Amino acid sequence: MLILSSRYAMKRDVLIIVIFTVLVLIIISRSSSIQAGRFMTTGRNRNLSVARSLYYKNHHKVVITEMSNFNKVRRRSSRFRRKTDGDEEEEEKRSIPTGPNPLHNK
C-alpha cells in the first residue's frame, strides 16, 4: 500500500507542476505580447479607433463636397429663375418687405 500511495502522490505532483508551468507560460507570453503591442484586444481597439477617425475624416470631406455642389446648383438655379421669370408678380412675391414688422404693430 505504501508503494501505491507514493505513485499517486508522484502523479499528483507531476500534474500540479505541469498545470503550474502552463499557466506561467501563458502569463509570460501575454505580458510579452502586451509589451510588444500585439495583444489581441489592444490591437483591435487601435484598429477601431483608426477606422473611426478615417470614417469621420472621409465623411467630413463628403459633407463639404456635397454642400459645395449644392451651393453651385442653387446659384445656377437662382440665375436661371431670374432669367426666365420676367413677371413683376413673381418678383413682388419674392421681395422682402422693408419697414416695421406688421406683426409687432397691434
Swiss-Prot record:
Record keywords, A-Z: Developmental protein, Differentiation, Glycoprotein, Hydroxylation, Secreted, Signal
Tree of life domain: Eukaryota
GO cellular component: apoplast
Residue(s) carrying Hydroxyproline: P97, P100
Region (Disordered) location: 72-106
Glycosylated residues in this chain: N47, P100
Coiled-coil regions listed: none
BP GO terms, sorted: cell-cell signaling involved in cell fate commitment; maintenance of root meristem identity; phloem development; regulation of cell differentiation
Disulfide cross-links: none
Segment forming the signal sequence: 1-31
Similarity comment text for this entry: Belongs to the CLV3/ESR signal peptide family.
Entry protein name: CLAVATA3/ESR (CLE)-related protein 21
Species of provenance: Arabidopsis thaliana
Lineage, highest ranks first: Eukaryota, Viridiplantae, Streptophyta, Embryophyta, Tracheophyta
